[in-house]
């Protein structure tokens, strides 16, 4: 899968969960910047889709929100298999 295809998945499926968790914990974006030790305004850029966090910062962000990241195998679609 090309990196371009991951953008909408990342922003539409994952980021709203991070935003909801941050708001539930009553943490501002600027406070989250400080917790993570990142530049002022970076969490805002992640949440708006302007920038994407590195894998490491993504894991740190989840941890700061008392969340875990779980990987699951892709569901195979029979239509995508080559036909002979």
What are these regions (language model features)?
Residues 47, 57, 65:
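DNA major-groove recognition helix of helix-turn-helix
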Residues 26-45:
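Short alpha-helical DNA-recognition segment
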Residues 2-9, 56, 63, 70-84:
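Short, charged recognition helix plus adjacent turn
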Residues 22, 33, 62:
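The alpha-helix within a helix-turn-helix
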Residues 2-24:
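A short, Lys/Arg-rich alpha-helix, primarily the initiator
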Residues 15, 19, 44-45, 54:
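Key DNA-contacting residues within the recognition helix of helix-turn-helix
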């Amino acid at each position: 899968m090309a990196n371009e295809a991951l953008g909408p998945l990342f922003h539409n499926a994952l980021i709203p969960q991070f935003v909801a968790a941050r708001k539930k914990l009553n943490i501002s974006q600027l406070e989250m910047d400080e917790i993570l030790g990142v530049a002022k305004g970076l969490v805002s850029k992640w949440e708006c889709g302007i920038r994407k966090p590195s894998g490491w910062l993504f894991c740190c962000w989840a941890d700061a929100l008392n969340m875990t990241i779980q990987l699951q195998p892709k569901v195979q679609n029979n239509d995508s298999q080559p036909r002979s």
